[in-house]
């Protein structure tokens, strides 16, 4: 389906960014736009988690490269989150699989009605069922998140955890598949990374040649274990954490442990004998970076462009889809500087006020929730919003 609208270069002054940066709203009211990708021609593609007029993918085209995206093209009759484009194919995910579309000589999708299946039949239990994906550096493998539908891997109706947590056999991690083989099924994959309740934000760091993932933390400590956790602790724990997976089998520890960013320790989950103080997970990974609880990291991008100032080169941008009771902040894009593949400074807020209201003293409903990130060929940063359906372009104006 083709669509046209009457756009203009709308400067989004309500979005707060560092001095020298400018934010423009290149589209709005698109629907539940999740992850993004940008072609080398500068066309922006977004995946929708809910169909809009029967379509789950939208292409935004700036035909004359003037910064105004005057054309829309809708296709793909399946909802989902993951999306990516390279020189040969356009890729998109449903909640059960990943598909690819061949590109023509102009970098356009040759036939929007003829996707090929890379993998299908992945577990989908209706909750935390997004299938974000990423390729490794040499494009030999594709890595797909399969989130857990059970927040703490607790036996229903009890306060006890499943021990062992059988969910980890088919969820709670990232699975590796052959990137160049068609019609694969779940059983063809390798569980590459485990111990991740739900990693909506995953990426391949080209500098370290390794997989990075942003883990959504569990919740409801006080609801089920008031003897160990106060309501405030329940609001402020556990950390939302960034992990680096260097090899198959690396384990972030869920559901047996969680990371407490206040104690700077891996703590045994109460379902498995913990009391909020007992440490564990000696064999589990330590986080690369720990963020406040319940911020909902939904995408991560390592910046490779040259448009932004030097401090941003190879650093990590993270789109946060929720808010922190601890900070009274949320719905923002954060930045972590990196040097030689390691964080070189504290995380900071890069783009803020997507919410459109002061979260410490809200006066109205939330307006926008950052969800996806993408880098354009000119080094611009794109941010999707799956609440208001806007897409933003952040540029550095020298």
Located regions from the model:
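A short helix->beta-strand "capping" segment at the edge of beta-propeller domains
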Residues: 13-31, 345-349
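Beta-propeller domain segments
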Residues: 16-17, 130, 148-187, 196-198, ...
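Surface loop/turn motifs at the tips and blade-to-blade linkers of beta-strand repeat domains
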Residues: 26-30, 73-78, 118-125, 190-195, ...
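Beta-rich catalytic cores
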Residues: 29-32, 53, 71, 78-79, ...
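Residue-level detector of Asp-centered blade-edge/turn motifs that repeat once per structural unit
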Residues: 38-41, 85-87, 135-139, 203-208, ...
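Conserved beta-propeller blade signature
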Residues: 43-47, 89-92, 141-145, 210-214, ...
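Asp-box/WD-like beta-propeller blade repeats and closely related beta-sheet repeat scaffolds
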Residues: 71, 80, 96-137, 193
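Blade-level signature of beta-propeller repeat domains, shared across WD40, Kelch, NHL, RCC1
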Residues: 374-398
């Amino acid at each position: 389906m083709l669509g046209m609208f009457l756009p203009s270069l709308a400067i989004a002054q309500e979005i707060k960014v560092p001095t020298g940066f400018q934010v423009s709203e290149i589209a709005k009211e698109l629907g539940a736009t999740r992850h993004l990708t940008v072609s080398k021609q500068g066309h922006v593609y977004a995946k929708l988690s809910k169909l809009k007029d029967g379509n789950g993918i939208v292409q935004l085209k700036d035909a004359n490269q003037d910064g105004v995206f005057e054309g829309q093209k809708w296709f793909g009759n399946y909802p989902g989150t993951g999306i990516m484009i390279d020189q040969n194919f356009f890729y998109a995910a449903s909640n059960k699989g990943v598909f690819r579309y061949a590109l023509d000589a102009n970098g356009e999708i040759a036939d929007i009605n003829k996707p090929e299946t890379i993998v299908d039949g992945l577990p989908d239990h209706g909750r935390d069922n997004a299938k974000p994906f990423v390729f490794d550096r040499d494009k030999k493998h594709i890595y797909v998140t399969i989130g857990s539908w059970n927040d703490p891997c607790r036996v229903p109706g009890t306060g006890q955890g499943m021990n062992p947590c059988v969910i980890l056999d088919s969820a709670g991690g990232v699975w590796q598949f052959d990137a160049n083989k068609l019609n694969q099924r779940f059983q063809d994959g390798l569980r590459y990374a485990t111990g991740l309740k739900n990693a909506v934000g995953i990426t391949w760091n080209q500098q370290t040649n390794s997989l990075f993932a942003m883990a959504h933390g569990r919740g409801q400590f006080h609801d089920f274990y008031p003897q160990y956790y106060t309501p405030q602790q329940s609001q402020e724990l556990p950390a939302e954490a960034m992990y680096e997976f260097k090899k198959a089998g690396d384990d972030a520890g869920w559901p047996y442990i969680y990371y407490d960013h206040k104690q700077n320790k891996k703590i045994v989950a109460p379902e498995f004998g913990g009391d909020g103080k007992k440490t564990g997970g000696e064999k589990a990974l330590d986080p690369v970076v720990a963020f406040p609880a319940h911020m909902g990291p939904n995408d991560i991008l390592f910046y490779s462009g040259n448009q932004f100032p030097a401090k941003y080169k190879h650093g990590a941008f993270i789109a946060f889809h929720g808010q922190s009771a601890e900070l009274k902040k949320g719905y923002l894009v954060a930045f972590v500087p990196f040097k030689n593949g390691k964080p070189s400074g504290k995380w900071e807020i890069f783009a803020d006020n997507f919410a459109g209201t002061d979260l410490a003293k809200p006066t109205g409903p939330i307006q926008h929730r950052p969800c996806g990130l993408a880098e354009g060929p000119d080094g611009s940063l794109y941010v999707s919003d799956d609440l208001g359906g806007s897409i933003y372009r952040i540029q550095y104006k020298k």
